[in-house]
Amino acid sequence: MGSSEKLRHVLVLGDSLAFQGPQGIVAPTDPRLFPNLAAAQIAVHFGSPVEVDLVAREGWASRDAWWALTKDPVVFGTYLPRASAVIIAVGGMDQLPAVIPTYLREGIPYLRPGRVRRRTRRLYRDLAPKIMRATGGLMRQLPQSATDRYLTRIVQAVRAISGDIPIIAMTPSPYYSSYYPSQKYHDQARASAFSWAASLDVPMVDI
């Protein structure tokens, strides 16, 4: 993109880190958040205002971002067509260790009756960190092959719809949490992210 072109909108596909401030969740317009910091820097460079279209949710993996891009009409019908650049900021949740398959964990809210759901949720919250400490995590939340596949689909879809607009990706972030007391999969996920980005000629920001 030449310096004479005006950058107006940046589409950010993210997870909870896109709206998580130092003390917790904040409004998506908070200037401390990385999508808004990036937009501010881009605005200075191009000399025109830049707005962020943030599509993110707590716990989102690359699969969820793909679903949002292809199933949410606001995203594929409004945000993507007007985007001058796309930031792919998912993949960090994919690498988190898990003690049960993700589809089972995500199915807990649908359990009925309510007492069964509440008991199952408490049991999971009590046992999962202990099992993770003991095992380092039996599996990832999403296999690396699936992460690469969904990220590739996102890039291909953006390029098919919006041509050669800039696409930037971010490496999986390190994490420190009592719920995920393991860095077991981080180094591999980070290395895989660089390999994936190189294969599709996508610039990667190392966080």
What do the PLM-derived regions correspond to, one by one?
Residues 1-58, 72-82, 86:
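Serine-esterase "nucleophile elbow" of acetyl-processing enzymes
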Residues 18, 63, 95:
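Short, electropositive, low-hydrophobicity segments enriched in small/polar residues
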Residues 19, 61, 176:
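Flexible, glycine-rich phosphate/dinucleotide-binding loops
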Residues 22-28, 64-67, 179-184:
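Short, solvent-exposed loop/turn segments at secondary-structure boundaries
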Residues 50-51, 64, 98:
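Short linear functional motifs in flexible/disordered or boundary regions
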Residues 59-71:
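Structural motif
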Residues 73-207:
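Alpha-helical cap/lid subdomain in secreted, periplasmic
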